[in-house]
Curated annotation (Swiss-Prot):
Stretches for region Disordered: 403-435
Protein name from the UniProt record: Tubulin-like protein TubZ
Gene behind the chain: tubZ
Subcellular location: Cytoplasm
UniProt record similarity statement: Belongs to the FtsZ family. TubZ subfamily.
Result, substituting residue 238 to A: Loss of GTPase, forms polymers twice as efficiently
Length: 435
């Protein structure tokens, strides 16, 4: 989804005014990148606003901010050294400064249509502050959702446990707020590795933050930037309803050339579209998960040259049947064909599909993380037990019960004894000499 959509940015209008409340190092970096998104909209070059909340004072220095006027930093004083991956410290820091944070929310997000709480699950500050931030916005009746990154399996056990602990708490209360957008770091890391095999490891963070920001920004542009081809439309108000739907939200995108869309033989492109839905942009879904969705929408964008030929009754009917098959129980599932009047010559043969599916259950990736935690614990226990047994066996095999033997008393030796003649009974014994 992220990537080449400059022609949208150059002429596009955003559907909703987003505010981003970034928590912790990861959450602040994502929120700042979202606030860095630019448009050519007059008097609204930077359409999003962000509040960055963190403990570690050094983390702010790592974040690039293009326009300081739409980003506010809040340093949680007294916790400048960070939370050391301890969520309890992060929660404590947020509570101590909650009044200051809420004042910033009221000032910065007063005109926002929707607020995203952004957080990298697994650390201390963001993970710890997350539940308190949810409570704060919920109690003051804000429309908000969550933008959360899931850790890779390569992360330490504590990180994985911190993440799943917070997901469990969120799942218990998810009906109280809007959509949850999950970002699978394992998926994005693989994509980064494939696209940039010679890149430095520290470039991934910048790549992933931009990828996330681009994905959300692009779908927010699609719903307000193009000319509807028919009466069926997926407008800003409908988009707002979708992201206010409790549960997990999935975004998907597919680009095809117009000659790949044969309405008389639709199996090929419908299969590709189905795969795109399941792959998603930010995390993978399974078909069974999609079938439990509450809302879905499919937007299609192409050039004026191709729109007149492609958007016939047969094609749109195929799209309706496709989305009905994939999301059979949703409340709404609009199909919205659009014409991009500003398509470049290079892209006039391209057809783009954008899907939004809301109200989904937690994905299999969360289950995979739990399985990884279980595996690590079991292997650690086995390794510790094996090492302990080896030491004990060696210890018990060692005989340290040898009794001390009393040293034998040394015999005195004064040299050879003088020969003594046996006295004859008939003669007196010879007197010994005495010196």
């Amino acid at each position: 989804m992220a990537g080449n959509f400059s022609e949208i940015e150059s002429q596009g209008n955003i559907s909703l005014k987003f505010g981003f409340l970034g928590l912790g190092m990861g959450g602040c970096a994502i929120a700042a990148e979202c606030a860095n998104k630019e448009t050519q909209i007059k008097n609204n070059k930077y359409p999003y606003r962000a509040i960055l909340v963190n403990t570690n004072s050094q983390d702010f220095n790592k974040i690039e901010i293009k326009n300081t006027g739409n980003v506010r930093k809040i340093q949680l004083e007294g916790y400048e050294q960070g939370a050391a991956r301890n969520p309890q410290v992060g929660e404590e820091a947020f509570v101590k400064h909650e009044t200051k944070i809420f004042e910033a929310v009221k000032q910065e997000f007063e005109d926002r249509d929707f607020i995203w709480i952004t957080c990298g699950l697994g650390g201390g500050t963001g993970t710890g502050a997350l539940l308190k931030a949810i409570e704060m916005l919920y109690e003051h009746d804000y429309n908000f959702g969550l933008l959360l990154t899931l850790p890779r399996d390569a992360e330490a056990l504590k990180v994985l446990e911190n993440a799943t602990s917070r997901i469990r708490s969120i799942a218990m209360n998810q009906e109280a707020f809007g959509s949850i957008v999950l970002i699978d770091n394992a998926k994005l890391y693989r994509k980064f590795e494939e696209e940039n095999p010679s890149a430095l490891a520290n470039e991934y963070t910048s790549y992933s933050n931009k990828y996330i920001a681009d994905a959300l920004h692009e779908i927010n542009l699609v719903t307000s930037s193009f000319t509807p081809f028919s009466d069926t439309h997926f407008d800003a108000s409908e988009f707002a309803q979708v992201i206010n739907t409790p549960g997990v939200l999935s975004l998907a995108k597919l680009e095809l050339k117009s000659n790949q869309l044969d309405t008389e033989n639709p199996l090929g492109y419908l299969t590709q579209l189905g795969n795109a839905l399941e792959k998603g942009v930010l995390y993978d879904t399974e078909r069974e998960e999609l079938e439990s969705a509450k809302k879905s929408a499919l937007s299609i964008v192409t050039s004026p040259l191709r729109a007149g030929r492609l958007y016939n009754f047969s094609f749109l009917n195929q799209m309706e049947n496709f989305l009905k098959e994939r999301t059979p129980y949703v409340d709404e599932r609009p199909i919205a064909p659009y014409v991009n009047k500003h398509t470049t010559k290079k892209e006039e043969d391209i057809v783009k599909f954008y899907s939004v599916v809301a109200g989904l259950p937690l994905p299999k990736r969360v289950s995979d993380i739990i399985d990884e935690i279980t595996r690590i614990k079991e292997e650690r226990e086995q390794a510790n037990s094996k090492k302990s047994n080896a030491v004990l066996n060696k210890l018990f095999a060692f005989d340290d019960s040898v009794q001390e033997e009393k040293p034998k008393k040394k015999k005195l030796n004064f040299g050879a004894e003088p020969e003594v003649e046996v006295a004859d009974d008939s003669q007196p014994a010879k007197k010994k000499l005495s010196f």
